[in-house]
């Protein structure tokens, strides 16, 4: 299926504080070499004064500036995040207010690290010809990290990225070509974060009240096995729907979870090195923000051109996976 899906602008926003692997060695028993060998990560950005909302607002403002559109031209704002500042109001309505997009409907989605590519599907389904959306992934995962647990603390970073997308008819480039999405809820317990304690005057439960269940808990081997099996399958199914081969794709914009996972996916699909851009070394795993941050850098560095075919793939908590095939 080919429908219009034109990306008019891309942007990213990062906290000013950068934390290196060497700095983490002061908090836990680890080393720079240990982290690099197992994850490919050298540093990550950590929010101090920034919030999930402020990072998302920065991205939205950049998108409007690049596209030269007024905020009142925006019809839809979706923020993908698993680390909102509040349960309510959600992040997207705060972005709407900050930029003055009074006509836009605005809501958040939480599909963890797969959130951005699920947001792409929602934008594709929602937009009518002539309408425009802001799709933003924004995370401050540092609030969900136990900074003494080296199995998870070394992985995550904070940041935001986004796209301004329009369903502009009669264009020769900018199309949605296909997609694939799947959820494996029975395996959801292999990756958890943010457990809320059940506390009220009538409850005898203490779920998470006296523990660190709010922090990331992950069965690394199970998540790795899931990703290296289901991500290639999702990409293959999305390409099949788009009636394309992997050789037709300029770049695979994968969630930057772990360099070993990304490389394994590339090997299973027989992809060329230049088809698998990576920036995890600089930012770590920024969950729903990772694909739009990577894509914004690719555009800025002129690594993609109009008419290029791309695959965006996200995977993670849920457990969930999704792939979107587009023409830029």
From Swiss-Prot:
For this protein, the record's Gene3D superfamilies field holds: 3.40.47.10
A Gene Ontology biological process in which this protein takes part is: secondary metabolite biosynthetic process
| The keyword Lipid biosynthesis is assigned to this record | yes
NCBIfam families with a match to the protein in the record: fabH (TIGR00747), PRK09352.1 (NF006829)
Q: Which organism is it from?
A: Lactiplantibacillus plantarum (strain ATCC BAA-793 / NCIMB 8826 / WCFS1)
- Source superkingdom: Bacteria
Task: Indicate what this protein is called per its UniProt record.
Answer: Beta-ketoacyl-[acyl-carrier-protein] synthase III 2
Q: Which CDD domains match?
A: KAS_III
* Active site, UniProt feature: 113, 255, 285
Protein location: Cytoplasm
Q: Which GO terms describe its molecular function?
A: 3-oxoacyl-[acyl-carrier-protein] synthase activity; beta-ketoacyl-acyl-carrier-protein synthase III activity
Provide GO CC annotations from the record.
Answer: cytoplasm
| Domain remarks | The last Arg residue of the ACP-binding site is essential for the weak association between ACP/AcpP and FabH.
Instruction: Please describe the quaternary structure of this protein.
Output: Homodimer.
Write down the chemical reaction(s) this protein catalyses: malonyl-[ACP] + acetyl-CoA + H(+) = 3-oxobutanoyl-[ACP] + CO2 + CoA
Pathway the protein contributes to: Lipid metabolism; fatty acid biosynthesis
């Amino acid at each position: 299926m080919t429908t219009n899906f034109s990306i008019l602008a891309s942007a990213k926003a990062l906290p000013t504080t950068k934390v290196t692997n060497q700095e983490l060695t002061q908090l836990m028993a680890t080393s720079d070499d240990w982290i690099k060998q197992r994850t490919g990560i050298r540093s990550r950005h950590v929010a101090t004064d920034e919030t999930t909302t402020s990072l998302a607002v920065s991205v939205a403002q950049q998108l409007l500036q690049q596209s030269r559109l007024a905020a009142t031209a925006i019809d839809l704002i979706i923020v993908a995040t698993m680390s909102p500042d509040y349960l309510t109001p959600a992040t997207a309505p705060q972005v709407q207010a900050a930029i003055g997009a009074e006509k836009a409907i605005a809501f958040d989605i939480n599909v963890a690290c797969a959130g951005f590519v699920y947001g792409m599907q929602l934008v594709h389904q929602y937009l009518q010809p002539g309408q425009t959306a802001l799709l933003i992934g924004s995370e401050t995962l540092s609030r969900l990290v136990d900074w003494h647990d080296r199995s998870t603390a070394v992985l995550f970073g904070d940041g935001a990225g986004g796209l301004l997308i329009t369903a502009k008819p009669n264009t020769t480039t900018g199309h949605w070509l296909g997609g694939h999405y799947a959820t494996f809820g029975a395996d959801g317990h292999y990756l958890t974060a943010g457990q809320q304690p059940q506390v009220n005057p009538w409850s005898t439960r203490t779920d998470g009240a006296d523990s660190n269940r709010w922090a990331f808990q992950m069965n690394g081997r199970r998540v790795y096995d899931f990703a290296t099996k289901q991500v290639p399958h999702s990409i293959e199914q999305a390409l099949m729907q788009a009636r394309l081969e992997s050789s037709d794709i300029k770049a695979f914009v994968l969630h930057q979870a772990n360099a070993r996972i990304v490389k394994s996916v590339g090997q299973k699909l027989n992809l060329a090195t230049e088809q698998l851009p990576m920036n995890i070394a600089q930012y770590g795993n920024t969950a729903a923000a990772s694909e739009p941050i990577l894509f914004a850098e690719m555009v800025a560095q002129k690594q993609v051109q109009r008419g290029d075919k791309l695959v965006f793939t996200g995977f993670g908590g849920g457990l969930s996976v999704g792939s979107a095939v587009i023409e830029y």
